[in-house]
């Protein structure tokens, strides 16, 4: 994917691989059309706000690849609750991305209700956890994405056939290589 265009009733903006977007995001916008590499995608069956749809699209895109990866200690692993799971199919098979939050937020002042700070991710059950740079995520997705019920987003794409968002409440994105590669 080279670019993503998001069109709303009032304005549109694009994301590219540099992380730049052409118009400022605003919570509450409703999506009206999505294009990936100039191809119009299947419309969602229920309305999504612009933050949520941007997050789902980012999960499918090799954007923002400046993640830092490291192996957690046993103590650190016990301190993390994996509250979200993304299951999706690509042309190279099925993958799973798990989204974690600290079990005790009082130990982690970098976390707030709105999701600012460190994210913990496990890709395909890998013991390696990726730390997401907070300014990169908060800058792109300023509000918390709350996905309390399962939702399915279908894309007419040669690279991705489907994505399923399960229980979870963190805004994250997928990159098409494991964090420890």
Where are each of the predicted segments found?
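A short-motif feature that recognizes glycine-rich, charge-decorated loops
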Residues: 1-181
């Amino acid at each position: 994917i080279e670019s993503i265009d998001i069109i709303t009733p009032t304005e549109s903006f694009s994301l590219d691989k540099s992380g730049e977007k052409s118009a400022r995001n605003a919570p509450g916008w409703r999506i009206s059309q999505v294009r990936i590499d100039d191809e119009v995608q299947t419309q969602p069956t229920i309305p999504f706000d612009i933050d949520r749809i941007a997050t789902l699209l980012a999960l499918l895109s090799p954007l923002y690849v400046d993640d830092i990866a490291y192996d957690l200690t046993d103590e650190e692993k016990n301190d993390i609750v994996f509250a979200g799971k993304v299951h999706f199919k690509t042309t190279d098979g099925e993958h799973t991305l798990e989204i974690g939050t600290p079990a005790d937020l009082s130990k982690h002042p970098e976390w707030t209700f709105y999701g600012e700070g460190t994210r913990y991710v496990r890709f395909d059950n890998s013991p390696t956890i990726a730390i997401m740079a907070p300014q990169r995520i908060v800058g792109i997705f300023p509000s918390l994405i709350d996905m309390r019920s399962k939702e399915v987003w279908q894309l007419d794409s040669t690279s991705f056939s489907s994505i399923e968002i399960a229980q979870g409440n963190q805004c994250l994105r997928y990159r098409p290589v494991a964090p420890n590669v």
